């Protein structure tokens, strides 16, 4: 039951009765996995735990990655300081290479000032906003940790790296891990500090304007500051850097359109979602988190689904340029808002589009224009 799962002593007593153990021998327990089963009127919290019988834990709650010094090592240019770029830089350090991260936006703290101006003054800095800047689009729009991709890679390692840099170890446990917009900036700063302390570089307000191509080989980048950076290049530019994709297209780089999803963001009272999901007119009570939902259906043979559900959160203006109307959702770590929201989108397939591989970018641009 939720109230038992929330109290360590109650949990020890429950396990002792269930397994026939003297609870005095249970010196500690560690929750390894946690999920909520709300399919029936009686709500259960499913836990996987590790017991320490007549011993105290000696192991850490997360696995640390060793990052060695890379001064003087071959350098690799990483364009973009969102999650893709930051994790690419950390991985390069593991491989004994020196990352040089180039980010068009500002550092995560200065970026917050520009984001506040969007709501307060209705002014959008096209280089520093909800999409551009250290931490990428997720830094100030929720910090949810999940992937729909079937090519998942080592998700556990990613979560452990986040914990190593200050995220709560609850992300290793919860079925739907979430750091929270209020906690994530500090984690991102710590990741940047690791990169710099190991001998890497991070350059803010430095936009890649073009790739340097010599003898049909990429050898570096040119930036808006006039400075060039030489070395192999990793593009981690995210979904809003349309100028990058236009440059690649104009310079003959082979590109293929991918499907996208287009829709709206819905907002509901958190209490309403809690009442529905937890089958209780009084809502979630003291021991349950703000309720989530996931919606998937087919309409005329086309997928329609909810996306980026933010329980106990806010709808935020997420334009990355002037004359745009774009929104996103976010939740603080406690998910304590009286409102919940979710995207509701329909898939658009490549075959729906023109032969132009940039047509999805053009469609997004037109959809976001304020008219």
Predicted segments, located by residue:
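Residues forming the flavin
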Residues: 1-45, 49-140, 144-371
């Amino acid at each position: 039951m939720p109230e038992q799962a929330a109290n360590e002593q109650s949990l020890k007593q429950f396990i002792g009765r269930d397994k026939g153990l003297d609870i005095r021998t249970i010196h500690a327990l560690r929750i390894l996995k946690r999920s909520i089963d709300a399919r029936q009127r009686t709500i259960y919290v499913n836990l996987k735990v590790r017991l320490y019988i007549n011993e105290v834990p000696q192991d850490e709650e997360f696995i640390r990655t060793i990052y060695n010094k890379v001064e003087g090592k071959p350098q690799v240019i990483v364009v973009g300081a969102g999650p893709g770029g930051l994790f690419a830089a950390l991985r390069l350090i593991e491989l004994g290479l020196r990352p040089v991260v180039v980010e068009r936006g500002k550092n995560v703290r200065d970026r917050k000032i520009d984001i506040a101006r969007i709501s307060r003054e209705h002014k959008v800095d096209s280089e520093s906003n909800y999409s551009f800047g250290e931490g990428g689009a997720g830094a100030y729009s929720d910090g949810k940790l999940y992937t729909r991709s079937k090519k998942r890679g080592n998700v556990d390692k990613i979560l452990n790296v986040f914990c190593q840099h200050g995220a709560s170890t609850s992300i290793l446990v919860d079925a739907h891990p979430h750091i929270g917009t209020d906690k994530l900036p500090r984690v991102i700063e710590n990741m940047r500090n690791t990169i710099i302390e190991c001998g890497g570089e991070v350059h803010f307000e430095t936009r890649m304007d073009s790739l340097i191509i010599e003898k049909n080989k990429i050898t570096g980048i040119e930036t808006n500051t006039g400075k060039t950076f030489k070395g192999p290049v990793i593009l981690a530019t995210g979904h809003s850097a349309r100028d990058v994709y236009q440059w690649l297209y104009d310079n003959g780089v082979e590109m293929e359109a991918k499907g996208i999803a287009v829709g709206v963001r819905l907002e509901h009272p958190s209490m309403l979602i809690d009442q529905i999901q937890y089958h209780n007119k009084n809502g979630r009570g003291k021991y349950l988190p703000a309720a989530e939902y996931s919606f998937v259906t087919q309409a005329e043979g086309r997928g329609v689904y909810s996306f980026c559900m933010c329980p106990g959160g806010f709808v935020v203006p997420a334009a990355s340029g002037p004359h745009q109307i774009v929104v996103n959702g976010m939740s603080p770590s406690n998910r304590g808002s009286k409102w919940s929201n979710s995207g509701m989108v329909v898939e658009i397939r490549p075959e729906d589009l023109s032969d132009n591989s940039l047509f999805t970018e053009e469609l997004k641009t037109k959809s976001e224009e304020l008219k």
